[in-house]
Amino acid sequence: MPNYNSILLESFRQHPSIIPFELNRKLTDLFPEQHVLFTMDYDFDLESFARDGRCSMWVLDDLQALVATWWRGREKGTEFDAVHVLSEILWNGHRLRCLKTKERCSELHFVIAETPHVARAFFEAVCLWTSDSDRRVTVYDGRFRRDPDLEKALLSSSWDSLVLEESLKSRLQHEVHSFFTSREDYERYGLSWRRGILMYGPPGNGKTHAIKSLLNLAGKPCLVVRSLNDEDDSDESVIARIFSRARQMAPAIVLFEDIDSLVSRSHLSSLLNELDGLARNDGLLFLATTNHLDKLDSALSNRPSRFDRKFEIGNPKAPERERFLSSRFEQFDQEMRPTSAGIETATKQTKGFSGAMLQELVAGCAFSWVRDRTVGSMDKILVQEIEALRPKEAS
């Protein structure tokens, strides 16, 4: 029986850059009559492929498996992540083996099959299945990975709880919808089929929520960029790799949240080259947010060819505050609701409140009422909660 434990141990004694080569060499020597396919492609999501019933897979005890245990909070509980594992696979009448291991932030898979054709066909089947989703979300945070939790969150995102002007909502929705439905118009007039939208304004007013709702509306793949750094690679190479992945996903959305803190001076030149360079970005809609427009380099904020549309997401105005408060309190039992006069007073007193502060105001009122349970007291509770939330400098 092959000693997989020794193979793994000896390979991991090498320099990190040599580990894939060493493992591939040892496995090839071990199975001279078979083919070894090596991949680091994040689309090779073998575990999910098997869970969906696309193949049968079971763990072999030839290798002492190393499984990391993670606590994901009360809601998700305990999760397990295989670090080193050897599996046997039955797929389309073929029997294969797969050695999965991890080196730093990268997953390494070695597929062992009877022929190169079978290994490649299996690899392509897994990758095609993984990427065959219009709503797939890919995150780059030093490596590319799927984010099923964010995919689920997008499906439940709506505009109902956003405290935004209706006209602003409509304009944002129109920009995204019209981009993905107007490819022929762009081509007819010789325009590059790419756009950039920048949302800016103080925190707590729904930029992130609006982004999720726009992604849900578009129903397109999304690449969420959470880092432009890789300790083993240059900024230029990392950014080129991100844009290369985005172009493979097109038509798609590329999201840079809090772009002012994401992009440093060392990143700027490479990022601008990818946005403006020779490689075409057809089918890519770039979405970015910032809390501090003044901190964003003017090369990004003031060049229409990079972010064509800028939308200010500021503190809600009186009509939006009144509409939000009325809508939320209507969901309460009758005895918990404030009067029309109470809503009107609260609308005036919450000038300068962010959307998040209004959300907190409603929650605070509910908690206070449940504690005291005095019918008809919500007008008074509203005033008290507003004072408690009011920024000190505004009092």
Give the location of each predicted region.
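C-terminal alpha-helical "lid" subdomain
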Residues: 303, 314-395
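Amphipathic alpha-helical interaction elements
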Residues: 111, 164, 276, 367-374
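AAA+ P-loop ATPase mechanoenzymes
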Residues: 1-181, 231
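Generic structural signal for secondary-structure transition and capping sites
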Residues: 131, 181-184, 251, 280, ...
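Residues at alpha-helix boundaries and the short loops/turns that link adjacent helices
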Residues: 14-17, 249, 265, 352, ...
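Secondary-structure boundary motif
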Residues: 29, 128, 248, 277-280, ...
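Hydrophobic side chains in well-ordered alpha-helices
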Residues: 118-126, 210, 324, 361
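Walker A/P-loop NTP-binding motif of AAA+ ATPase domains
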Residues: 159-341
